[in-house]
């Protein structure tokens, strides 16, 4: 929305004029609560935008100020109200947990207020402190909630959103049934996608490419009809199979032996053995012919996916002995010791999460 409604509409009109936009297409625009007005929302909806993603982040105004956000929670409420008035019936709220000075009580209040706004979709992301950003100075600060506190916040989110009808379909994404983000699902299901602009990435079939990142160079090149592709690669079966594991296990749909072996002509047995180990530890479940992570598995998904990729590589080495020495030199991913027991003792016996103490927690 910072770009301005008029220019966003001009951009969408250019897309319509250049290609074929399906009538049922999901057309999302990200908006900041402080930079969107009712007349802008009406114009956007009339032009064909049909989904809003609103950056709420937190309901605590003090935390919003601390992280440099210019809006208040009241402005979030007004943005949602104006969006409904403008005709939007598909709204997503973005939330962040693990923020500086944020407590579990703060997070529970943010969740409650977000749910009360009745959006069709809610995304809840753990804070990531990126080097080079102003907040990176807080990396080792006691203001940042501990890993255990952030894990508690995550599991609280899963429980509360489920209780109010939001189904989890990916590590950080929840929706009323039928309102999953189709844009996001394209990535996780390895569908084709196209990006436009400096630094944008695309993947068509087995070809992945990106444009140059420098804005001035990109503009000059486009105006002169130059090819602005900066990086280009063809994806082989092994790499595509790895992406299938990485992206599939981010979702509750998970992965399937039949799909893996049919699509990539690769042996799934080593991966299946690793998944069975995850099941024994409480990190994954088998649902029919598919495997997917449990909430505790999602908490350490990066480590677990690393183990699955190692199982995939080990199986490849068995069929290609010449690769074995190189693979054996690679560092191995270590599973966190006692994670299953810690999860059981800390979370599964937590009366707030199990719902046994909800009345007394109000």
Please identify what each model-predicted range represents.
Residues 280-289:
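A short, conserved structural fragment
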Residues 1-266, 320-329, 339:
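C-terminal scaffold of the Radical SAM
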